[in-house]
């Protein structure tokens, strides 16, 4: 077997006149009667190879037998294509290879779907079952090439900044808070279980107490939670921790790293600092803690209308400490019919809204179901508050503040997609800061950590832990990209007494805290430095930088929405012998 000269997708005019050896898969084959053209494919792309009896009759005969997805080796001379046959759609479109020798390395059965880039309308379950074939498609091959470039850029940046890449355990202890753990039974310790890590949070804090100062890890994490388009049961995290830093230091580091990645991978220079917004401002203006700022359509408080108008829904909402907010779809009045508005009403119902009120602005006032409730002065108030003009569609939700935020926040994104308001070429990074430290869980009747129990409160709010925990703010920060939470971080608690107080507020007894987190509390007794960090979702970063819409397209062998692997049929049953060794019995 001859040595490969280069990749198929890298054969350019620089190789003109050279005899080269290529190896790859037959993407397609065209027999023109006396001449056979084959598009030969590998991970870098496609090149056209020509079988001409003038160069080799024997090679032509073999080429007559090859079919799609055969693995072949060809030798030949690189020549310039005739001007009328140049293919500007591919990198190698100026040249072709006149084949003098071909060897069939391996044959292929007819694939269950075409690998050709033009045929992508295949049921996703079929693609996942034959994932090794799906990954041959150039679109996915380029996605994973970019994933490699992104991780390489991250590693180079962190290495240059003095971070140590340190691995942490995969078999660890199950702890409360957060999503459900994936559990691993121990054979050696009867009836006891390990948990797969949801993140290396506690270990990276222990590494700071160990004195390593700067740590990072590109690490697998596991969460047994309900899936959606941007969630997987196992995912990859860029995990970072630093000692003797404050919030500003961590945010600056994260920002510089992301700018470097975007410049190296996308060729895009991001000038200036990333915009910042407090959690309260994000919720007030966008109804989301991860707002998409590529378009406007902000939420506008029009609660004044509830005090001025004789419209029972608005009036009752304000009297019961609710609020009324509106969004304006510019120029969309004619585009949305009453049937469309009914569909939008059903959409906001999903988020708890009882209804969606709306009006269309016309030259002489308002039309729509609630237009008749607006007196002249009410119309003026609405137009002044919202800036709405003739031709605009104004939508209202009147309810509790959290319902208003969630429903209108989701609606603005839906409308932006329908109206084509989103510039898909933009990369809008945003820091969301000043998060609540705690949230109240109505079902459990207790406080839970908004991020995790190891996030430090702002120094001015420490006293509130004993008096008004719901008012305490955290030294926490999330990085958002185009409406997706890319990652989050915080300055951690490094004082044992404060950590114990935090556990107490979260409803742990001293005994429970010691049993679950005693190793951390013990470590705090031996001199813990101030420390903080951030964790970024690598799969999600790749998804956004490659303009994919599904996280599964960025993971080589992903799970389905029901957390199954269609390729290997995992999860699967195990033998009675294995269960017996683990002292387990399955109840059906």
Swiss-Prot record:
PROSITE patterns: AA_TRNA_LIGASE_II. It holds the Pfam family GAD. One of its GO terms (cellular component) is cytoplasm. Residues 201-204 are annotated as: Aspartate. GO terms for molecular function: aspartate-tRNA ligase activity; ATP binding; catalytic activity, acting on a protein; nucleic acid binding; transferase activity. ATP binds at residues 223-225, 232, 485, 537-540. It comes from the Bacteria. The keyword ATP-binding applies. Its main location: cytoplasm. Signal peptide: none annotated. CDD domains: AspRS_core, EcAspRS_like_N. It is found in: Cytoplasm. Transmembrane segments: none annotated. It catalyses: tRNA(Asp) + L-aspartate + ATP = L-aspartyl-tRNA(Asp) + AMP + diphosphate. Belongs to the class-II aminoacyl-tRNA synthetase family. Type 1 subfamily. Homodimer. Catalyzes the attachment of L-aspartate to tRNA(Asp) in a two-step reaction: L-aspartate is first activated by ATP to form Asp-AMP and then transferred to the acceptor end of tRNA(Asp). This is Aspartate--tRNA ligase. It comes from Staphylococcus aureus (strain JH9).
